[in-house]
UniProtKB/Swiss-Prot annotation:
Domain annotation HTH crp-type: ranges: 155-228
Protein name per its UniProtKB record: HTH-type transcriptional regulator ArcR
Gene transcribed to yield this protein: arcR
Domain of life: Bacteria
Role: Positively regulates the expression of the arcABDCR operon under anaerobic conditions, thus playing an essential role in arginine catabolism. May also control the expression of genes encoding proteins which are involved in anaerobic metabolism. Can bind cyclic AMP.
Location within or outside the cell: Cytoplasm
GO CC annotations, alphabetized: cytoplasm
One example of a Gene Ontology biological process annotation: regulation of DNA-templated transcription
Residues binding a nucleoside 3',5'-cyclic phosphate: 22-141
Principal cellular location given in the protein's record: cytoplasm
Keywords (A to Z) from UniProt: Activator, cAMP, cAMP-binding, Cytoplasm, DNA-binding, Nucleotide-binding, Transcription, Transcription regulation
Length: 228
């Protein structure tokens, strides 16, 4: 690696550290002594970030892009959770030995900073404000997961798709006054997988929502009216 490349990577890590410090509401100076233990990585669309959350030793802050986290239970059920920047994950790995089985995939080109899990736990024990922030983030994540799981209990297909779209607007959508924008990674197939219904049925429901002027396509992005 040339000197210029090393300088660029060092600057990249410094900038990522600033974003991490801002995200968890602490002075960047608290994190700087641990910089050598962290890394910044770029993931291409479709690349696996980790195959199983019980194997990863790091907590990640997603700086750019979109990811999908797939949770598998003992019955073989799959729950798919989507995230956009900024999100810290997987938080349910903290302070416990047994963790849910989760795989993470980059839905778009992504950039993230990895922080050792034991470092995050150490900082929580020594800085109350970090613990409070992470507890708040974990509670928010749990509420989002409950909302998604409740959507899956809907017996009517259209109601299920509609509720999942509302969930997606909150978790990966960008607020534009009268509508939410969901980036181009969203597809009929992905929505079908998340809803647990056929692609054909999902496509039919999406066409109905477009006819009702609830959902629009802007290039490859989805625009969802707040009237949904």
């Amino acid at each position: 690696m040339t000197g210029n490349q090393m300088f660029c990577r060092e600057n990249e890590l410094d900038e990522s550290f600033k974003q991490l410090a801002s995200y968890i509401n602490i002075p960047v100076g608290v994190l700087l002594p641990f910089k050598s233990q962290c890394f910044v990585r770029h993931y291409n669309k479709g690349q696996i970030v980790y195959y199983s959350s019980d194997e990863t030793t790091h907590i990640y802050l997603l700086l750019k892009g979109n990811i999908m986290r797939e949770n598998f239970n003992l019955n073989g059920d799959v729950y798919r959770y989507l995230n956009r920047e900024k999100v810290l994950f997987p938080l349910n790995n903290l302070f416990q030995d047994k963790v849910p089985n989760e795989m993470c995939t980059a839905l778009t080109d992504c950039e993230m900073i990895g922080i050792p899990r034991d470092l995050i736990e150490y900082l929580c024990k020594n800085h109350e404000e970090i613990f409070v922030k992470l507890f708040s983030l974990l509670s928010e994540t749990q509420c989002q997961h409950i909302e998604y799981n409740m959507a899956l209990t809907s017996k009517l297909a259209k109601e299920r798709v509609t509720k999942i779209l509302r969930y997606l607007c909150q978790t990966v959508g960008y607020d534009h006054d009268e509508f939410y924008e969901i980036k181009h990674f969203m597809t009929i197939q992905l929505l079908s997988d998340m809803a647990g219904i056929s692609r054909e049925t999902t496509s039919h429901i999406i066409n109905e929502l477009r006819e009702e002027k609830i959902l629009f396509k802007n290039s490859k992005n989805w625009l969802v009216s707040k009237d949904l």
